[in-house]
């Protein structure tokens, strides 16, 4: 597993003041990716270069691991992020998937600015199901003349580790499954247990007359199953604890974020 060493390299770069460099004010997508790319290159890790629609963003060549990057402006939206058409997961096409969340200043005074804090986590912290397959569907027949096409293009929004875990803000944190050992140089600062819900959404229906969306649930075959994660810090960093927020607090913050996004 390369995740721990990649995290170490990222933290060392942050400590050394290695800045994000954007090409211009309109570069809102690739600047953090480019910063991370340089960390992989510094480690001489071979990877497939990311494309606009590839998932995850970086796939290692000699190890079945992938890294999905999410840059977040701070202060700003931090409770959730747009997954677009890819539900977060911990495994994809035989690769273990890790997510890298980095926050940077919302209004930098130039095109070079620091990584404020960073979380590298296993994707199963965000969602434990690796079986769901996203597909876009459509039908024709809508409208007065029955010739308008309706596309069903699902877009997903998931919580960030900053919303899930207390103690991640303003720190650099590695979060792994409890079965994974990061090796020497890492100090555990918290254990988190995410419990699968009793009912999961299996269908939804959208009424074109009322613009109402309704969901149908079914029993979760893994109801009550706990997924255990351990948070680590690199030696030399602050060791204040990391803990999972209560579920009601997480949902409340996500609802608040969704309401602000709809305004």
What are these regions (language model features)?
Residues 1-56, 61, 71-263:
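Nucleic-acid endonuclease domains
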């Amino acid at each position: 597993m390369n995740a721990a060493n990649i995290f170490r390299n990222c933290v060392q770069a942050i400590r050394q003041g290695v800045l994000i460099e954007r090409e211009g004010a309109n570069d809102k997508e690739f600047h953090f990716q480019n910063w991370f790319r340089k960390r992989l290159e510094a480690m001489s890790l071979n990877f497939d270069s990311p494309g606009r629609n590839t998932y995850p963003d970086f796939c290692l060549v000699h190890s079945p691991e992938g890294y999905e990057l999410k840059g977040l402006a701070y202060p700003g939206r931090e409770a959730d992020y747009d997954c677009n058409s890819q539900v977060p997961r911990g495994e994809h096409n035989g690769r273990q998937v890790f997510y890298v969340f980095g926050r940077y200043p919302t209004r930098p005074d130039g095109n070079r600015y620091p990584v404020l804090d960073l979380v590298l986590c296993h994707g199963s912290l965000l969602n434990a199901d690796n079986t769901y397959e996203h597909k876009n569907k459509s039908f024709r027949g809508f409208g007065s003349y029955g010739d308008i096409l309706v596309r069903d293009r699902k877009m997903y929004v998931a919580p960030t580790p900053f919303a899930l875990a207390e103690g991640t803000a303003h720190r650099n944190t590695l979060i792994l499954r409890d079965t994974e050992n990061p090796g020497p140089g890492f100090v555990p600062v918290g254990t988190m247990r995410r419990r699968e819900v009793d009912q999961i959404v299996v269908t939804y229906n959208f009424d074109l007359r009322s613009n109402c969306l309704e969901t149908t649930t079914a029993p979760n075959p893994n109801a009550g199953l706990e997924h255990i994660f351990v948070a680590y810090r690199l030696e030399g960093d602050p060791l204040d604890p990391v803990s999972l927020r209560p579920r009601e607090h997480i949902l409340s913050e996500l609802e608040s974020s969704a309401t602000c996004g709809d305004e």
